[in-house]
């Protein structure tokens, strides 16, 4: 099926003291192309964990996610994530963060470099 299919998704985090936290348990969701969904709930209920798994940033403990019939195994150009607060990938330089989106879309490096140079100069961050 095309769209987003989440089947039997569970996520458990093991803690250093030997205990664990069950962040998600047996979540199943199906969205057809064009359908929208909001994820709402109190702090600590697993919203961010779910979205990080859908984006491919975390691997679930159990279950699977398929997007347009393809198994989600990591981040790629088919999915994105808008963070609650402004965020950069901490392990990347400012330039690498600016380059990330166009690179995921498959834009040629020369074109990405030109755009990154321009944008960084506009905001005065060309030296970062």
Task: List each language-model region with its residue ranges.
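Short beta-strand immediately N-terminal to the Walker A/P-loop
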Residues: 37-38, 81
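The feature captures the beta-strand-to-loop junction immediately N-terminal to the Walker
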Residues: 40-42
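Helix-to-loop junction immediately C-terminal to a conserved catalytic motif
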Residues: 55
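Conserved coupling/switch loops of ABC nucleotide-binding domains, chiefly the family-specific signature
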Residues: 61-64, 111
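Conserved ABC transporter NBD signature motif
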Residues: 63-75
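Short coil-to-helix segment of the ABC ATPase nucleotide-binding domain corresponding to the Q-loop/switch region
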Residues: 92-99
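Conserved ABC ATPase "signature" region
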Residues: 99, 103, 110-128
């Amino acid at each position: 099926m095309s769209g987003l299919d989440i089947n039997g998704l569970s996520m458990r985090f093991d803690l250093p003291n030997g205990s664990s936290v069950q962040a998600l348990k047996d979540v199943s969701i199906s969205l057809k192309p064009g359908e929208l969904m909001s994820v709402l709930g109190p702090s600590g209920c697993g919203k961010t964990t779910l979205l990080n798994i859908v984006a491919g940033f975390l691997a679930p403990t159990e279950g699977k996610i398929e997007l347009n019939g393809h198994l989600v195994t990591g981040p790629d150009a088919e999915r994105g994530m808008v963070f609650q607060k402004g965020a950069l990938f901490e392990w990347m330089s400012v330039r690498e963060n600016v380059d990330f989106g166009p690179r995921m879309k498959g834009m040629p490096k020369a074109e990405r470099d030109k755009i990154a140079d321009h944008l960084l100069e506009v905001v005065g961050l060309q030296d970062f």
